[in-house]
Design a protein with these regions (language model features):
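Short hydrophobic beta-strand element within catalytic cores of glycosyltransferases
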Residues: 289-293
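Glycosyltransferase donor-sugar binding loop
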Residues: 197, 220-234, 250
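Short alpha-helical donor nucleotide-sugar binding micro-motif in glycosyltransferases
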Residues: 252, 259-264
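Nucleotide-activated donor-binding/catalytic signature segment of Leloir-type glycosyltransferases, i.e.
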Residues: 234-252
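Aromatic "clamp/platform" in nucleotide-sugar-dependent glycosyltransferases that forms part
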Residues: 272
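An aromatic- and histidine-rich active-site surface loop
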Residues: 96-115, 123
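Conserved acidic donor-binding segment of nucleotide-sugar-dependent glycosyltransferases
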Residues: 304-315, 323-328
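Membrane-proximal helix-turn-helix segments that form the acceptor-binding/catalytic region
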Residues: 31, 85, 137-154
Length: 360
């Protein structure tokens, strides 16, 4: 089967790019593309133009430069359409897969009859299908939702998302995210109490982690926060540098990030919405407990006793941090529980085959 993944920066994950800190969907596209290529499928990633060479093969995956479709600039997006069409005509994929929200899903849907491919949408964030994206972006959001509904196939990454699709009259194949193989053995010691990792976006609510660090001054805190929303990032960085028990790090490439999870006792999530965070997976690989303000995909925190869910209550988040850090037996149980989640839920071969079943 020939599959083309339409993804702005997934090719940079395969390149092990030092400058770009990839988002979760980009990482998962790269991992899935590599697994599928290993199974003998013809896999292409059509990536945004960041100066990379065209037709480079990385880990068995052909990468194509599809122009500046990724910049967020409407004029550049429209100008990139001829190049995207050229790549699609040259590659002639059976399936085009889009993971995560983008107005390009509508454009690709419109191109389907002329170029002969089938279109799959894989949901990355819950907000892509629960109406939040449309409320934030009324025009592009409506086009995006129309395209989601009219795709030839859909995938969810949690059973919660599968239920949302079903409640909105759509079917979706439920598969779980893939694991990024470790490049180094897990370190023995844990020198950080509370770790927060995410790109700087409003929905990640980074200032709430700063509130937590200030509220628990005895905790050794670390924040890895690459810039995306510049104004928000500048306010976060300025404030973070005034907190004595917090180390602020601007960016860490994905192929180096696991060591930071390894060194942490507890991973903290303050987001309003996620899908299945890659950070939860990496925390599980590290034997790191979870402290989540709101996000709990498929009820995993209670199911595996992998940490504490605060019910979107900052007082409970602070209490949860203090409780786990003061009770070694509870912390150890949560760390073991999160590691067990990885063992029971995440198998690359199994989940890759489930993904493929959704394209039949």
């Amino acid at each position: 089967m020939k599959i083309l993944f339409f993804s702005s920066f997934a090719h940079l994950v395969l390149q092990k790019n030092q400058e770009r800190t990839s988002g979760g969907a980009e990482l998962q596209v790269a991992l899935l593309a590599r697994e599928l290529a290993g199974l003998g499928h013809d896999i292409v990633i059509a990536g945004g133009d960041v100066g990379q060479a065209d037709r480079r093969i990385l880990d068995g995956v052909l990468t194509r430069n599809a122009g500046k479709f990724h910049t967020g600039n409407l004029l550049e997006m429209l100008s990139a359409i001829p190049r995207v069409v050229q790549v699609l005509r040259e590659e002639r994929p059976e399936w085009v897969v889009v993971m995560g929200w983008t107005a390009w899903l509508f454009i690709l849907w419109a191109l389907r009859p002329f170029l002969g491919f089938k279109l799959d949408f894989t949901c990355s964030l819950d907000s892509e299908i629960n109406g939040e994206y449309r409320r934030e972006h009324p025009v592009f959001g409506r086009l995006f939702e129309f395209a989601v509904r009219h795709c030839d196939a859909r995938h969810s990454i949690t059973s919660d998302q599968e239920k949302v699709f079903r409640n909105r009259g759509m079917t979706a194949t439920f598969y779980r995210y893939l694991l990024m193989p470790r490049s180094t053995p897990r370190s023995a010691g844990k020198s950080v109490d509370l770790l927060w990792v995410s790109r700087c976006q409003q929905l990640k609510r980074p200032h709430l982690f700063l509130d937590l660090a200030e509220a628990v001054p005895s905790a050794r805190c670390q924040m890895i926060c690459p810039c995306e929303d510049l104004a928000l990032w500048e306010s976060v960085k300025k404030r973070a540098l005034t907190i004595s028990n917090l180390e602020f790090i601007e960016r860490v490439p994905y192929h180096q990030i696991q060591e930071y999870y390894d060194a942490a006792q507890i991973f903290v999530n303050t987001s309003t919405y996620e899908g299945f965070p890659n950070s939860f997976i990496q925390a599980g690989l590290a034997g790191t407990a979870l402290l989540s303000l709101r996000v709990d995909p498929d009820g995993m925190i209670g199911l595996f006793h992998s940490g504490i869910l605060a019910g979107d209550d900052m007082k409970e988040l602070i209490k949860g941090a203090e409780t786990m850090l003061s009770r070694p037996e509870l912390l150890d149980e949560a760390q073991q529980g999160n590691a067990r989640m990885v063992d029971e839920w995440l198998d690359n071969e199994r989940n890759t085959h489930i993904f493929l079943e959704g394209l039949t």
